[in-house]
């Protein structure tokens, strides 16, 4: 089935199968625009799509559905302090 992927304000058409794992979807997105796989965080209807699941685990995904992608940039430095509440580096950044 064909779905839309929205990343950095651009939309791409992406062919997916119900048996495709989310890791495979991330790889396909990487092929579309070069974003590193580890920075790709797909969402459907506001819910994170988890690694280890497949497209069929998300019944709301049908032909023409839109998958939103958040790109989370991580600091390369192991010395950056992490926030107690979120556990994320203060240098983390989310791009949509």
From Swiss-Prot:
GO terms for cellular component: cytoplasm; nucleus. Gene3D superfamilies: Phosphatidylinositol 3-kinase Catalytic Subunit, Chain A, domain 1 (3.10.20.90). Residues 75-96 are annotated as: Disordered. InterPro entries: Ubiquitin-like_dom, Ubiquitin-like_domsf. One of its GO terms (biological process) is protein ubiquitination. One of its GO terms (molecular function) is protein tag activity. Coiled coil: none annotated. It comes from the Eukaryota. Residues 79-96 have a biased composition (Basic and acidic residues). Belongs to the ubiquitin family. This is Ubiquitin-like protein NEDD8-like protein 1. The lineage of its organism: Eukaryota, Amoebozoa, Evosea, Eumycetozoa, Dictyostelia.
């Amino acid at each position: 089935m064909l779905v839309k992927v929205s990343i950095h304000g651009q939309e791409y058409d992406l062919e997916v199968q119900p048996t495709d794992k989310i890791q495979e979807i991330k790889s396909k997105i990487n092929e579309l625009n070069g974003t590193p796989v580890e920075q790709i965080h797909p969402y459907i209807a506001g819910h994170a799509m988890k690694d280890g699941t497949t497209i069929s685990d998300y019944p709301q995904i049908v032909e023409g559905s839109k998958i939103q992608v958040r790109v989370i940039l991580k600091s390369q430095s192991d010395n950056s302090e992490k926030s107690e509440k979120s556990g994320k580096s203060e240098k983390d950044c989310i791009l949509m």
